[in-house]
Amino acid sequence: MEFSTTLALFFTLSIFLVGAQAKVPVDDQFRVVNEGGYTDYSPIEYNPDVRGFVPFSDNFRLCFYNTTQNAYTLALRIGNRAQESTLRWVWEANRGSPVKENATLTFGEDGNLVLAEADGRVVWQTNTANKGVVGIKILENGNMVIYDSNGKFVWQSFDSPTDTLLVGQSLKLNGQNKLVSRLSPSVNANGPYSLVMEAKKLVLYYTTNKTPKPIGYYEYEFFTKIAQLQSMTFQAVEDADTTWGLHMEGVDSGSQFNVSTFLSRPKHNATLSFLRLESDGNIRVWSYSTLATSTAWDVTYTAFTNDNTDGNDECRIPEHCLGFGLCKKGQCNACPSDIGLLGWDETCKIPSLASCDPKTFHYFKIEGADSFMTKYNGGSTTTESACGDKCTRDCKCLGFFYNRKSSRCWLGYELKTLTKTGDTSLVAYVKAPNASKKSALAI
């Protein structure tokens, strides 16, 4: 027994010593200070200031960038400055936690990649210290990896997507299972939209501080019976000798076969493509050609279009009309109010209530109007008047939607974009203060 214990201790100590002896060679270590002039002046997504540095590959480069003064994000961009095409961002380390001038990015002999403020406060790190790391590099597919002496990845950027999936990158059940949109082109914080891998499908959600739970506004479903999705990967699949298709491919725990949904067939090299949940709530696939110049980028897939092929036009995106608006075929063309349909502009908003007391407000009705929430959320079965009573008793409810054919009711904690349908069995009710005029709007 004593011999076994001693032997086990010996092997444990040996493994520890081997790991401890593995260090990053001096020539592969670096310390970058966020200072000095800017490096990239080609057209750049979000119109930021950029400082690029090593490591980089032919098509990818690690950079500091900012869209507001003295607030920098550590990010990976794709594109080639020589082509004069737009450089785009495909991965970020510190969204929502920007660093200032003179911040540092350090890759030392212990193998940890650390982003810190000038005063030493750590903002982000890979937590790879003393794990046998010997190097860092960016692969041809845009995956930034930290690896050991056997070439095994100790850390990889593919495991922590933000709003983007590169070809070969996945959402995982036991890992990062969602993408989260950017708040806006100028503000790099988490936005209200997310693409989530659930047990049997991919779902687009809209979430704000007013919604009791995320509201689904689009779903990717699969015709194959699924037990539990383990992962969903953005893949480039060779269809023929000269054509490639872009798919989302899922691995199901209950089947030996993958499930797949086809997205697009780029005319360029499909392997330099990425799928992104945009700040506007749409999903787009961008494909890049290393041969083209200013036309290097193609949008090869868009989830919400205005071609009327599947009913999922841009009016189905919650904030397409910003604060409030009535939409048809992707166009925000009216601002509903209880004095009529007014012309829409960016100032359109829902009525403001001074009190939750039912005596102080009423509803105005919009016939033929639908909501982004009704298609993928079941609602409840009740009468039209009972639906209104529920909203009236709920101070957070801004209005409600009712389907007279199915007797389904949805309470609206965010109204945002309404869709004009022409179907009078669909009706929307909006709370308005009693100081304004009551009106029923037929559209």
UniProtKB/Swiss-Prot annotation:
Disulfide bonds join 387-409, 391-397. WD repeats lie at residues 254-296. Pfam families: B_lectin (PF01453). This is EP1-like glycoprotein 4. SUPFAM superfamilies: alpha-D-mannose-specific plant lectins. The keyword Signal applies. Residues 29-159 form the Bulb-type lectin domain. Residues 356-433 form the PAN domain. It is found in: Secreted; Secreted, Cell wall. Keywords: Cell wall, Disulfide bond, Glycoprotein, Lectin, Secreted, Signal, WD repeat. Residues 1-22 form the signal peptide. The keyword Glycoprotein applies. GO terms for cellular component: extracellular region; mitochondrion.
